């Protein structure tokens, strides 16, 4: 079984990443990955794309056909156009329902898997020490706080370890974000910086 230290750290890391990137962004990424897998749903999307190309081709041809000069051809294209449009709308509604179900399942799974760990483990293992502080290194009030709420005195409780993981991960993500913004700004500034014109050489 993985260590409780690692489980708590990974859980808080996942929660912080979701909060930083956004649940919608993560759902979109996982949805695109899911559609690349050989599933019936990905096959439906491929069929929809082919039908959409066919619809656009018929629509283009319909616009280029005169209803007065070529009525028979225009009427045939019109029926084909309406049939394809109806099929596309039905398929779109079906695929949107599948996407909604996917998002709901993903959100529920993510919430249950993270929140259950965040709430259940600290409650269940509240008396278990995560690790022990070096004896005599810290004053009484530090040891009391580290063992809050019910871990043995002189140890670090699972609640305090969870708080520490959350704080450290949040700081790391904030620092990484600031570094990326700084690098991007430097690159943008370098691109915008005008190239100085070379001075003409003086005649000797």
Swiss-Prot record:
InterPro entries: Get1, Get1_fungi, Helix_hairpin_bin_sf. The keyword Transmembrane helix applies. It is found in: Endoplasmic reticulum membrane. Its main location: endoplasmic reticulum. GO terms for molecular function: protein-membrane adaptor activity. GO terms for cellular component: endoplasmic reticulum membrane; GET complex. Residues 1-4, 132-155 are lumenal. Residues 25-110, 173-204 are cytoplasmic. It is a multi-pass membrane protein. The keyword Electron transport does not apply. Keywords: Coiled coil, Endoplasmic reticulum, Membrane, Transmembrane, Transmembrane helix, Transport. Residues 72-107 form a coiled coil. The chain crosses the membrane at residues 5-24, 111-131, 156-172. One of its GO terms (biological process) is tail-anchored membrane protein insertion into ER membrane. Required for the post-translational delivery of tail-anchored (TA) proteins to the endoplasmic reticulum. Acts as a membrane receptor for soluble GET3, which recognizes and selectively binds the transmembrane domain of TA proteins in the cytosol. This is Protein GET1. It comes from Podospora anserina (strain S / ATCC MYA-4624 / DSM 980 / FGSC 10383) (Pleurage anserina).
């Amino acid at each position: 079984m993985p260590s409780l230290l690692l489980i708590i750290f990974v859980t808080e890391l996942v929660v912080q990443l979701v909060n930083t990137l956004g649940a919608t962004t993560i759902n979109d990424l996982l949805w695109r990955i899911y559609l690349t897998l050989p599933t019936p749903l990905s096959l439906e999307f491929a069929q929809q794309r082919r039908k959409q190309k066919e619809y656009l081709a018929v629509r283009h041809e319909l616009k280029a056909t005169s209803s007065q000069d070529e009525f028979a051809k225009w009427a045939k294209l019109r029926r084909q156009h309406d049939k394809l449009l109806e099929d596309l709308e039905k398929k779109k509604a079906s695929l949107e329902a599948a996407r909604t179900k996917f998002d709901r399942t993903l959100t529920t799974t993510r919430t249950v898997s993270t929140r259950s760990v965040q709430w259940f483990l600290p409650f269940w293992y509240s008396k278990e020490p995560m690790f022990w502080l070096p004896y005599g290194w810290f004053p009484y009030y530090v040891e009391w706080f580290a063992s809050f709420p019910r871990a043995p005195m002189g140890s670090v409780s699972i609640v305090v370890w969870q708080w520490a993981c959350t704080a450290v991960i949040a700081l790391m993500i904030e620092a990484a974000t600031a570094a990326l913004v700084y690098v991007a700004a430097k690159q943008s500034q370098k691109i915008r910086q005008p190239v100085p014109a070379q001075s003409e050489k003086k005649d000797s």
